[in-house]
Amino acid sequence: MAKQAPDVGDYKYGFHDEDVSIFRSERGLTENIVTEISKMKEEPQWMLDFRLKALKLFYKMPMPQWGGDLSELDFDDITYYVKPSEHTERSWDEVPEEIKRTFDKLGIPEAEQKYLAGVSAQYESEVVYHNMEKELEEKGIIFKDTDSALRENEELFREYFASVVPAADNKFAALNSAVWSGGSFIYVPKNVKLDTPLQAYFRINSENMGQFERTLIIADEGASVNYVEGCTAPVYSTSSLHSAVVEIIVHKDAHVRYTTIQNWANNVYNLVTKRTFVHENGNMEWVDGNLGSKLTMKYPNCVLLGEGAKGSTLSIAFASKGQVQDAGAKMIHKAPNTSSTIVSKSISKNGGKVIYRGIVHFGRKAKGARSNIECDTLILDNESTSDTIPYNEVFNDNISLEHEAKVSKVSEEQLFYLMSRGISEEEATEMIVMGFIEPFTKELPMEYAVEMNRLIKFEMEGSIG
């Protein structure tokens, strides 16, 4: 019996377009497929060697025995590379019409005109559009799709590529290393501070598609950058796979904020590795919004290498029927007087499952380090579940660690108070949820906060009755 596409009602991003690709690899993962990807991109020999070595690692490494159910993920039924257009365009008018219509629906041109210093749009396996304000280029900022950076900035690229997340890190990092395509490459020179966000948007359009972007950000000494990414996919009856790798290097006194708003359809496996190295007095902020997907497994990681380095993760996860959000954070304290903060907000409804999974590690040299963890979960019905799985490793007796976890339901007292003011039960529940996520949305740029609130309100529709 054929599978039915998931019922997502009026899911805004669930539309899909006709296949307009100019090349599509055969399904399945082989040395020939990996070699074909590298040859089509005209990569140097060292990158092909890296890919093939990663493929061997992928075959050898076991599947994770923890987290969500991956038993239905069939690596032989995935298309690993789809080339949607001949090359990356610098003018929106030159993007192929069918692809442009998709991004018009998603509001990318409007967002670029109003809010952004630079924007990159990836469709399937390749970046189809990329633009950056000229004045940023004059400051020495590099913002390119990752493939272009490999061709045009090979020495800088090679210095940092796979230095934070090696291919052997985990099975899905190995998979990404073998078949990576697209993503963003950012370099901000010493003491250059960029306040206006750079944005990338990742769209899966095809069925049984794998998207494997690789993002690499380097903030040199005293630099700062704010990067925002958004992700969506159509609704299909079969599964797609999104397995990205993000590597960030925060040099001395530098600051990076990395914001993700994902709203995948619930046929997408979202299995992502994100890690940053933070040097002396550097500051790394992860702001992570997880909606949709069949299964998300994502744990942004800060490795605090230099004295006074700071790391923080602020995340929200929303799981509804048939969805598992297995998310959290990792903070690795390797140096004295480092500090970290984790604030995790989770919501589950209609049988959805949310899991906070986190690690805080204090090494032997982490004298005076401190970490604060807050995990709050709101469960909206009796069918939904929540788990909190913290793991703390302490190898230094001169540290401070605080951990607070709270699970709650919408109380009858709260509802009664609001309903006595003439507010319906559904509106009252929505107000309580919006108040619950306010610590997250207030950290977003205004236009993203508005969109996040709209997405949460959409998820809340039909929660009562």
Swiss-Prot record:
Pfam families: SUFBD_core, SufBD_N. GO terms for biological process: iron-sulfur cluster assembly. It comes from the Bacteria. InterPro entries: Fe-S_cluster_assembly_SufBD, SUF_FeS_clus_asmbl_SufB, SUF_FeS_clus_asmbl_SufBD_core, SUF_FeS_clus_asmbl_SufBD_sf, SufBD_N. SUPFAM superfamilies: Stabilizer of iron transporter SufD. PANTHER family: FES CLUSTER ASSEMBLY PROTEIN SUF (PTHR30508), UPF0051 PROTEIN ABCI8, CHLOROPLASTIC-RELATED (PTHR30508:SF1). Belongs to the iron-sulfur cluster assembly SufBD family. This is Iron-sulfur cluster assembly SufBD family protein SE_0610. It comes from Staphylococcus epidermidis (strain ATCC 12228 / FDA PCI 1200). The lineage of its organism: Bacteria, Bacillati, Bacillota, Bacilli, Bacillales.
